[in-house]
Each structure stands twice: as C-alpha cells, then as structure tokens.
C-alpha cells in the first residue's frame, strides 16, 4: 500500500512538471511574466486549486474501472501508475504535450484488462472519450470567437497600449489557468489513491480523505515548480506566435473549460488538450497559415496514442509485477 501511495505521488509530481507549462507557457511567451515568477505563481495556484473539489476524483476512482477488494488489485493500481509515469516521461523527453490525465486513465484501463478487473466502458465513453473530443473543439471555437471579439472591440485602439494592458491582464488569466490545472489534475491522483485505499480494504466508501488531498496538492505544486521547459517552448512558440491579447484569450478560454468540466460534469479532461486547442483558436484569427499545423499534427498524434500506449505499458508492468510472488 505504501508503494502505491509513493508511486501515486510520484505520478502527481511528474504531472506537475509535465503539465506546468500548460498554465504559464503563453504568459512567458508574450513576456507578461518572467519564467521564474510564472513558475512560482503556477505552483501556488495549483496548490490552491487542489482543495476546490473532489468530483473529478470520484469519477477517476470509481467511474472508470471496477476492481475486487484484494491485495492483487493494489498491483493493478501500481501498474496503472507506472504505465502513466512511463508515458509521461517519454513524451516529456521528446517535448510532446500529451495528456497526463489520459495517460493515467489509459494506465488504469490497460492494467485492469490485463488482470481480473472490469472496465466500465460506458463510464469511459461518457466521462473520458466524449470530453476528450469535445473539450479541444470547444476550446478552439470559444478562443477563436473571444479573440475575434477582442480584435473588434480594440480595432481603433493604440496597439502598444492594448498590448501593455493585456500583458497585465495575462497575470490574472495565467493564474486562473493554473488554478484550473490544480482543480483538475490533483483530483486525478486523489482518485487513484482513494481507489487503492478502497481495494486494499483500508476504507469502505469512496470518500477522499483530507490527508490524500494535502499530499496530492503538495506533490503537484512541487512538480509544477520543477517546471517543464521543453513543453513550454512547444506550446508558447512553436504552435503559433502569440501576442498578449491572444495569450489572454487562450488562457481565459482554457480556464473556463476546465472549471465547467470539473464543477458541472465532474469529467477528467486534459489541461494540455484544452490550452493547446485554445492557442490554435486564437492563432487562427490571424490567418490559418499562422498556426504551424505540422507541429499541431505532431501533438494530435501524441494525443491519439496516449491512452492505448499508456495502457500497453501498464499491462506490461502488471505482468512483470505478477512475476514476483510477494505481490
């Protein structure tokens, strides 16, 4: 059990440094914030966001897979986490902003299929696959419309003054984005830790304990401060060149989508998918060629591969762990 908790917190930490760039890349790219100031702010807001709810944790822990209450089920959870961490590290190494959230869910599905557990496919479709498709589309369209409205509203204003104003505003939109990341992503680790406590027989109901919330929040904040510079560069510069108004529009859109899905639908969506699609949406208001679609294509490929590849690695981890009699 201790090993599962430690590995879960390690996943949370890697989630922090892997996804930290999502919250702050646009602000750093537009020079609204210095990298160090952005990282400190993102770490603090991630910490706060983790305390805002447990609805997503309930979905991840009880709505995706069903495992029997047995020590063997702890091995499934451990393998799921190892599969997710492995895929996170692979995509981080290559600078691809794949989704830590979907890596975790892919890991849970893969390890469960390799064992005697049951995958709740209706829950996977409703809470994972549909939001996985819808949230980037909504992010793209809303960001495009918001940026179009901003361009119209400030069409006669002095560009220099507009940029300065939005550069200041970006401090707030980046904070909102980081808060949304903490709200969404810390809960996923809370959900897995609580799942482990339930299947291990340490608690009977699926109630997220206060110490689980504190540990998940702290691990995510620490990982966020460690930073993710490779991915920050991909999001902030390689997809599209951003100015402060576009950075503000992208962050505001992404934060709104994160809050809505967490509080209203309790759906574990990807922070990465959401902000990347929003960045593409604001970039498309310049002209479609302003978005570097080749880079966007690489990112989409990584998205599509995340769930099956993390699942495959998790299944392999499960089979390897079962070779040890003590497990």
List each model region and its residues.
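Multi-pass alpha-helical transmembrane bundle typical of ion/small-solute transporters
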Residues: 1-327
